Amino acid sequence: LDLSFLLILPLWALYIGRNLPHYFALLGLPQDPRLLQGPYPFLLGLLAATGLFLSVLLHEVGHALAARRYGVATRRITLWLLGGVAQMERIPREPMKELVIALAGPLVSLLLFLLFRALPWEAGALGFLGRYLALVNLGLALFNLLPALPLDGGRVYRALLALRKP
């Protein structure tokens, strides 16, 4: 864990907690006044922020597992202020392997989106966490698929170009 991660987690938790009414509205949930008082906003914010960073970690683990399948070791996974990175020993020379490794992280995020979206939690703290983490994982997948390096989408684009190269 990078020091910036340890600094941002409580700040993100506080931000989410202070804006819970807006999040409930955004997620289409009825507001529960009990969750907006006392320690509950910060605790919900802390759970949501922790879920966000665990989602980023699982996204990066997806890359690491796909890389290992192709014999590419992952030196480390680092979580920091702006997300995470799986540092691999090398980039595979075969474009198809790079493509699979690049798509593995967004695929994990999409699977997490589907999992959280499928949960039967309709309201309250669990409803908030389920819908928040569904939205976060969908956003994580879509953002990472933007075709710009160093994002996964940039690596996908590079691999696709290499596959088309004569």
Give the ranges of each region predicted by the language model:
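Hydrophobic transmembrane alpha-helices and their immediate loop junctions
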Residues: 1-166
